[in-house]
């Protein structure tokens, strides 16, 4: 019985906190980021199962919240426009700002980036926080689109994400 806006803010705060924890595990404890992400994802999944009692949550979203994910503009779902805006913002950051260059440098060769003066720990930590925040945004939009929450949704997207990392030639 919580307003959708408040639930969205809490969701984003929780996701950002998960990003901070991931950053700590990767940067301070020196755990491989892929392994840390999978491990923390499992812990978060267990917490979600416990909190939700493994139930689907339906018919509790307001019509306004559902419109946020279901409306169309010019015959195209609004979710496409959200993705387009996010993509443009991320592209701009990556291609036209020092932070974007630092992210590319850190991802390409962390040691060389560090020797060039890039604060690689800060970049890795910030990237994990930003990724977690964006995952929260995606979860909110997804819930608005389908009109429900279930703890079984996330794991269905894990294998395609791992495959994307693998086929994208990322270092595991």
Go through each PLM region and give its residues.
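Alpha-helical transmembrane segments within multi-pass membrane transporters and channels
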Residues: 2-41
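Structural signature of hydrophobic alpha-helical transmembrane segments
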Residues: 4-14, 80, 151-161
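Generic alpha-helical transmembrane segments of integral inner-membrane proteins
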Residues: 9-21, 47, 81-89, 129, ...
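Transmembrane helix-loop junction
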Residues: 23, 27-28, 49, 95, ...
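Transmembrane helix-bundle core of multi-pass membrane transporters
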Residues: 29, 33-97, 123-125, 145-154
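Hydrophobic/aromatic residues within transmembrane alpha-helices
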Residues: 43, 112-113, 166
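Membrane-helix/interface signature in polytopic inner-membrane proteins
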Residues: 89-129
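Transmembrane alpha-helical segments in multi-pass inner-membrane proteins
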Residues: 132-135, 145-172
